[in-house]
Each structure stands twice: as C-alpha cells, then as structure tokens.
Amino acid sequence: MTVTAFAAAMHRPFFNGYSTMQDMNSGQGRVNQLGGVFINGRPLPNNIRLKIVEMAADGIRPCVISRQLRVSHGCVSKILNRYQETGSIRPGVIGGSKPRIATPEIENRIEEYKRSSPGMFSWEIREKLIREGVCDRSTAPSVSAISRLVRGRDAPLDNDMSSASGSPAGDGTKASSSCGSDVSGGHHNNGKPSDEDISDCESEPGIALKRKQRRCRTTFSASQLDELERAFERTQYPDIYTREELAQRTNLTEARIQVWFSNRRARLRKQHTSVSGGAPGGAAASVSHVAASSSLPSVVSSVPSMAPLAMMPGSLDPATVYQQQYDFYGSHANISVSAAAPMASSNLSPGITTTPPHHHQFYNPSANTASYIMPGENGNTTPTGNIIVSSYETQLGSVYGTETETHQTMPRNESPNESVSSAFGQLPPTPNSLSAVVSGAGVTSSSGANSGADPSQSLANASAGSEELSAALKVESVDLIAASQSQLYGGWSSMQALRPNAPLSPEDSLNSTSSTSQALDVTAHQMFHPYQHTPQYASYPAPGHAHSHHGHPHAPHPHAHPHPQYAGAHPHYPPPSSSAHFMPQNFNAAAFPSPSKVNYTTMPPQPFYPSWY
C-alpha cells in the first residue's frame, strides 16, 4: 500500500460498531480526528467497549488502543477508569455511575460461601467477608447488594431445570444478569436475543485488569540525555528514522523516546511562557525621577560625534519616554549650571539624555541646560562658552518658561496616563533641535572675537543684551498671546489649568484670521526655535558679544550649521506668510511655515516619527 493510499484509508470513515445506519443517514454522525465515526450524545457500542477492556488487559497502552480503534483518547480512558471502579463497561448516566463495591473477587467469594452453606443469610455473608479480611466495613457490599447477587446466581439453576423439563423460559428479567442465562433463557419468540440481554450479558465481562497500570518512571543516564538533547536541537519532532537511530544509540524504546520528546517540548513552551510573562511592558516605566534629576547638572558625553544623541533617549523604551514627556521637571527649575564649577564629563545615560525640548509641552531651558553645553575639541567645555550659553538660556527660560507666566497658551496636564492623545504626533528629532551642538572650532571662533575682552566683561555684555531681548520678547509674546487666545480657546479661559482631551483640529485653527495665523507662526517659531534671531527682532539692538551662530557670515562657517534648511537665507530668512500650512496634527495649535520655504536639497529626509516612538 502506498503512502497516499494509506493516508486515504486513515481518513476514510470507520464505523465503530453501530448496528444500523439510520442514525448516520439522519445526519447525526460525526467523524473524529482519527477517522472514527461517532454519534454525539450516543454511547459507544458495547462491543467496542469490550474490545477496549480486552486490549487493556493484554497490556496495550491506551494511546495505541485509541489509534487502532479510532476512538478518542478521552473516551478510552473514561471507559477503562469506569471499568476499574465498577467492573462494568455499561455506560453510566450523565455525571458518572455509582462505584460498585462488589468486585469480581468479592463476588467469587460470596458464591463460594453460598455454595458451601446455602442457608446462610446475606448479613452473615457480609460479616464473614469482613471477618476474613476480604474487605473492610467501608468497602463491604451492602446486605441488599449481596441478596441481589445471590438471587442472580440462583437464577441460572432454576432456568436450566425449567428448560430441561420443557417448561417455558422465565420472563428473562432475572436471567439477564449473567452470561450463562443468555444461552438458555435469553431468547425470545423469534429466536433473536434482545439488545438488553446482549448489553447486560457483556456489561460485566469479568476481565481482571491490573489496578495500577502505571509503570516505573524511566531514569535516563547522562549519555542518553546528551544524545536526546542533541537530537532535540536538530528537530523537535523526530521522524521514525530518527527515533529508530536514537533507540539504537540510547538502548531505549521508541515509545520512551517519543514520550521524552513530548515532555521536552512541553518544558520548552513553559520556559518561553515564563520568560515572556515575567517581564511586563510597563515595568520599565517605573524609573525613578529622582535618579534622573540627580545627574541633571552633569555634562553630556565627551565625544563630539555623540553630541547629537543627547537630543534623544538612547536606552529608554516608549513607556519611559511618555512618562518623561509629562514630567516637566518643575521641581528642578532652579537648577542651573554654575559658570565657575568645573564641567565633569560623564557617559551618556538616561538621566541626562532626556527627550528633546520640543517634545515637552513646557520647555524651560534653565531646567535642562546640561543638554545644550557646547563641547570643546578635547571634550571639555570652554568657560566662556558656558557662561554665555548659561546666561543666555537663563534669560530665555524666563521668557519661555510658561509655568511661571500668567498667560499660558498650553495648560499643563497633570495626568501622566493620557499618553495617547498628546504623545501621538510629537515632532521627530530634526536638525532644528540641534541648535547649540557645535564643534570646538565654532567655540574657538566665538571666543576669538572676544579674545581682547575680559570674561567678566563678556558676561556683563551678555547679561545686558539678554535682558533687553527678554524684555522685548515678554512684551511681544504677551501681545501675541492676548490676540490669539480669544480665537483659539474661547470659553476655556476659566479652565487654563486643565488640558483638553484631544488636540485642536486643523479645521478649528484654520478658521482664524490672517493676523492670528501670522501670530501663530511667530509663536510656533518661538517655541520650536528659541535660538534663532527672527526678523521681528531686527529692530532691537543686538547683544554686545559675538554669538557663535550669528557673529560671522555664513560662508566661512568652520562647522556644520545646525539649521541647514535656513542656510540659504541666513541670517534673515523670509518671514512666514499669512497662509500657514498645518500638518495632520497641529501639535497643540502650533503653526508651521509653508514647506516651500524649506531647502530640501540640504536637509536630509527625516521620518515623521522617531525610531524610538
């Protein structure tokens, strides 16, 4: 027989002894996974039940019985367990049948007692069974059960005598409890035995099964385990040839090898489940903010090429990033980098590499100054550059630190759990965020312009210029906010401490007037580009020091400009037009310039979402 024919024969319906096909023709028959036919709700025929018990008595394993008879393994186990308990193969009622106390051994002993002394009463038989140790009082059959058994044993003798004398057979009800009665008195008028007689005759075959069919556990040696593990590494489901080869090498049977592979696969699945379930995704979100804030004044990595990585978290998962996006570091607003303190370099760590400032709803440069320290050529920062940047960012922090202002364009959300509506659509880390990351040559050229001046004089000039700029920015930002707040927020003036559940849609923002759009353009540019001198600031006096970004023309730049898209129009690029272009999420009603202003030839393509989103 070919393999195809064997497979077809395996899937051919196998009729498990049902006498008629009327139930099958009525559509009640089903085919199980083994190809055997069963009728749902109908017990398995007695001949199949008897065959299961006989095969089990011959020492055949239940799994082999299941495959040969095409009966499910659960059905085989249930029939065998019930036969062990009751001594009967008859199907019980739903919920299981009552265990029969009178086992075949007890029945044989009762028959001996009755044959030796026919006048013995049932209660005397019970007491004798207990006295001789055949059973104890908890397992001894009841008096009524012994009486029924004695009457059933006496019935064949009466039927034999009545049939021998020519008298008609009995009613057949009493004689149905023994196999011998079926031959003499179980026939009806048509000469065909009834189904009840056959079922009752075969329900108690009297086959002695071993009470404990469990074998001793197999103990594997080290060499056997080594062979099995090597084979398991090659394949988890060995074929017949692999099992035969392993059986020769390990001196084990194929059945033992098959069981070992099954147990090994189960153990592997359990290990995978424990590993995947033991590390929940939210466990990394419980990073302490105290540890992150304690290392805040330290400097970013000493490698200049690693400086852009300070803008994005290196080893944080999205849950931690979302947690930090809602932590605005309000308790660390007073922490600033001291100009006289030596700047100690440290490794890039999650405590320092926080999310970019334009990913925070409230950007306070004075609270996160460490991410903007300008490294020198040897990794250390020059004191002059630190003084200027620290002073300049401290002044800008007073302008852009909206937690201390009375007019808040974006109210703070106190809940760190609403990470979907706010974290979705945050700006990716673009070259705009690398506003102060420059090489050592830029700092050298900046400090070279002030080589003849004293550092204290430079600090005074920087402070004076920054104060003038901050005063002008405060006045202008207050006017812009007052002009746009009524259009954008309307009735939300009384709810400034709360944040709306969803960001404003682009349609709501597009309904504003052209002047409001102009104001939104300016406000957005102030939020996301705090270090650029925009044209509206041209009327104010410039600071008294040479800034490293704007103190020299663009052509002889010794370092890569942090804003390549503005390189063609530096330092005065055209102001944003009144028709603002909005993205699908307008990022808390912040307008962006039209993409036609962007020089795509010099700006590398940036993904909309960062890699760690």
From Swiss-Prot:
It is found in: Nucleus. The keyword Nucleus applies. Residues 433-461 have a biased composition (Low complexity). Residues 546-562 have a biased composition (Basic residues). Residues 403-424 have a biased composition (Polar residues). The gene is prd. Keywords: Developmental protein, DNA-binding, Homeobox, Nucleus, Pair-rule protein, Paired box, Repeat, Transcription, Transcription regulation. Residues 105-153 are annotated as: RED subdomain. One of its GO terms (cellular component) is nucleus. Disulfide bonds: none annotated. It comes from the Eukaryota. InterPro entries: HD, Homeobox_CS, Homeodomain-like_sf, PAIRED_DNA-bd_dom, Paired_dom, PAX_fam, WH-like_DNA-bd_sf. This is Segmentation protein paired.
